[in-house]
Amino acid sequence: MDNVRKIVLLTIMLVSNSIVFSQNGETAKKLLDEVSIKMGAYTNMQIVFSTSLINEEAGINEGDEPPHNGKIALQGEKYNLEYLGNTFIFDSKKLYVINHDEKEITVNEDDLNEDDGFIYPSKLLTFYKEGYNYKMGKLINMNGRKIQFIELIPIDSNSEIIKVDLGIDQKTKHIYKLIQTGANGAKTTLTINSLKSDQQLSEMTF
């Protein structure tokens, strides 16, 4: 997935930029920690989301394809994710994948990972804690909400992900949008359309 990085003067500029980036990074990390504490304090969450893809290299431009909708229930390490025609149920020990089209169930001994370069909704609260540098991005008004973006840059220069722009609702401290730019320039956008916390969940959910 390619994108979206007189000697004395140059030295001064580099030093100045590194100081600003460090301060900027501390501010960004503080906000991320606030989000993690706020959302992590809920007993559970039910999230409805949509994803969209732009990949000009593959001829997929903005608006060419309808968004894919999904929903997820999260409780601690457990989750029930419905996405792309599959249901993923993780009971904190095993992952059950139900393929409704093929009418088959597979069982994995571990959780979903990002080996395919995609950040799954189940990882929203934890994916950034390791392997990224942070800096504050733009503050944008979206649908009447002030969304503060944080730019996350992978430390691994060989990562399939070039950067992740994480949009946080300034008022609620909830994650609203995630825009992931791949090494091939493809952009995957995940938007949280609704979030409910501390709901009464059935025992059969996980």
What do the PLM-derived regions correspond to, one by one?
Residues 69-118, 188-189:
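An acidic-aromatic
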Residues 132-135, 139-206:
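Gly/Pro-enriched, hydrophobic low-complexity segments
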Residues 18-64, 205:
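N-terminal leader/targeting segments and the immediate start of mature chains
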Residues 68-69, 73-75, 89-91, 164-177:
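A short, surface-exposed beta-strand/turn
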